[in-house]
UniProtKB/Swiss-Prot annotation:
Organism of derivation: Rattus norvegicus
Enzyme's top EC category: hydrolase
Family, as annotated: Belongs to the peptidase T1B family.
Site (Cleavage): G39, T40
Protein known as: Proteasome subunit beta type-10
Gene: Psmb10
Gene induction: Up-regulated by interferon gamma. Up-regulated by theophylline (THP) and down-regulated by 1,3-dinitrobenzene (DNB), two reprotoxic agents thought to induce infertility.
Modified residues (N-acetylmethionine): M1
Modified residues (Phosphoserine): S230
EC number: 3.4.25.1
Location within or outside the cell: Cytoplasm; Nucleus
List of catalytic residues: T40 (nucleophile)
Length: 273
C-alpha cells in the first residue's frame, strides 16, 4: 500500500502523477498516453456594422504539419459562423451538430436563429462531456439584437466580449487586440487589425501557420474570404540541385544470384450446381 510521504498543504497536487508512475513500474506494458499540443490561432472582434472572424490554416499532428489549408471557420447559420481551435475532429463535428440543430430550430419556429441560442447549445454540449471534447470556439454573428461575439471553452464556460482570441497563439493575438481595438471601428480598420492579430499569432507560435482566413458578418449576410493574407512566403531555392549521373562514386559493388524454388501449382474447378 502506497502512503503519502508529505502532508498535502494546498496548491498543486501531484498524487496522480505518482500513481501513474507506480502503475507503469508495476504493470509491464502500461504506458500513460501523453497529452499532445494542438496549435491554432483564432480571433474575432465586433466593428460598427457587424462581426469579423479570423483564423490561421495550419493543422498539426504533434510536430508534423498535417494540413496547410485547413478550414477553421465553420458555418452555423446564414448570419452566424464559428471559429474552432483544439482537436480538428471535435471542432468539426461539434459545429456540424450545432448547425443541424439551428436549421431544425429555424424550420420549426419560422424565425432566424439567434447567436445566444447557438452559444447555449454549444456550451451545454461541451459541459456535458466535462472537457473531453477538445473544442475551443469563437461564435460570432448578427441577429435582431445586433452584432455579438462569444468565446466558448472546452469545459462549457463562455464569455461575451467585444474582441477575443483563442488557441496556442492567442497571447500574441490578444496583446495586439488589446492595444489597438476601438469601439465602432470601420470594416477596413477591423479587417486590418484582425489580419495583424492572426499574423502575430502565426509568427509567435509554431503550431499556427499557413495563411489568414476571414469571415465578415453583417446584417446583409456573411462573406467568407480564404487566404486573405499570407504572412509567410515560401522560400525559393538558391540554386539547381540536379546532379549528373556518376557524380557520386561507387565504392563497392556486389551482385548476388537469387535462389528460386519452383513450387507445384494445381487448380481445381469449382463445382457449380
Amino acid at each position: 500500500m502506497l502512503k503519502q510521504a508529505v502532508e498535502h498543504r494546498g496548491g498543486f497536487s501531484f498524487e496522480n502523477c505518482q500513481r501513474n508512475a507506480s502503475l507503469e513500474h508495476v504493470l509491464p506494458g502500461l504506458r500513460v498516453p501523453l497529452a499532445r499540443k494542438t496549435g491554432t490561432t483564432i480571433a474575432g472582434l465586433v466593428f460598427r456594422d457587424g462581426v469579423i472572424l479570423g483564423a490561421d490554416t495550419r493543422a498539426t499532428n504533434d510536430s508534423v504539419v498535417a494540413d496547410k489549408s485547413c478550414e477553421k471557420i465553420h458555418f452555423i447559420a446564414p448570419k452566424i459562423y464559428c471559429c474552432g481551435a483544439g482537436v480538428a475532429a471535435d471542432t468539426e463535428m461539434t459545429t456540424r451538430m450545432a448547425a443541424s440543430k439551428m436549421e431544425l430550430h429555424a424550420l420549426s419556429t419560422g424565425r432566424e436563429p439567434r447567436v445566444a441560442t447557438v452559444t447555449r447549445i454549444l456550451r451545454q454540449t461541451l459541459f456535458r462531456y466535462q472537457g473531453h471534447v477538445g473544442a475551443s470556439l469563437i461564435v460570432g454573428g448578427v441577429d435582431l439584437n445586433g452584432p455579438q461575439l462569444y468565446s466558448v471553452h472546452p469545459h462549457g464556460s463562455y464569455s461575451r466580449l467585444p474582441f477575443t482570441a483563442l488557441g496556442s497563439g492567442q497571447d500574441a493575438a490578444v496583446a495586439l487586440l488589446e492595444d489597438r481595438f476601438q469601439p465602432n471601428m470601420t470594416l477596413e480598420a477591423a479587417q486590418e487589425l484582425l489580419v495583424e492579430a492572426i499574423t502575430a499569432g502565426i509568427l509567435g507560435d509554431l503550431g499556427s501557420g499557413g495563411s489568414v482566413d476571414a469571415c465578415v458578418i453583417t446584417a446583409g449576410g456573411a462573406k467568407l474570404q480564404r487566404a486573405l493574407s499570407s504572412p509567410i512566403e515560401p522560400v525559393q531555392r538558391a540554386g539547381q540541385y540536379r546532379f549528373a549521373p556518376g557524380t557520386t562514386p561507387v565504392q563497392t559493388q556486389e551482385v548476388r544470384a537469387l535462389t528460386l524454388e519452383l513450387l507445384e501449382e494445381t487448380v481445381q474447378a469449382m463445382e457449380v450446381e
